[in-house]
Amino acid sequence: TSNDFNTEGVKQFCHLLDSRQQADIFQQDLLHLYLNAQNELSTRALNTASIGAGATGVELAAELVTAKENFYKYGLNKIDPKKVKISIIEAADRILPALSQKVADHTMKQLSHFGIEVLTKHRVAKVDEDKIYFADGSNIEADLKVWAAGIKAPDVLTQLEGFEKDNIGRLKVFA
């Protein structure tokens, strides 16, 4: 289950990717974003943001690069792929904290090559319909936002007694 850390606006304005149904809704909203932009009189920049730079956030951003190119190829050509900004936002000082520094460094080079903006050391304080606000007072615009910043155990596990749990409520398993 996603852990929003009680960040204001996440539940209302961010997509979660905990289930196939949530992923399908994200896909539909991404397509609607492009279709609506295609039908606007003036072209504008589209901004997407993945909040969280673990495996989910990084992979999603990379897939959005392919998606923007495919949308253009398949007829949504009023939207210049160069005007589609893809951002990854991470509170920690680097991406992919569960992996080695070498893997993170290589991935950063690839993300840069794809034109993905990576903001590390940016803790999200609040999200609204149009923007993501950071603890330092700065903000960025984002039409479509995905919260991939952390996980926690399902709430049902809090009711289980007699089992040892870690700091985010997951059951400890001893093999």
Which functions belong to the PLM regions below?
Residues 40-42, 80, 139:
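Short, flexible hinge/linker loops that cap or flank conserved catalytic cores
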Residues 120-133:
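A conserved short coil-to-beta-strand element within the FAD-binding core of flavoproteins
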Residues 1, 135, 148-149:
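Short, well-ordered coil/turn residues at beta-beta hairpins
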Residues 13-39, 131, 140-144, 148-175:
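FAD-site-proximal beta/loop scaffold in flavoenzymes
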Residues 5-9, 62-63, 100-101, 157-161:
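Short amphipathic alpha-helical segments
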Residues 63-122:
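Rossmann-like dinucleotide-binding cores of NAD(P)H-dependent redox enzymes
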Residues 3-56, 63-70:
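Glycine-rich dinucleotide-binding loop and its adjacent helix/turn
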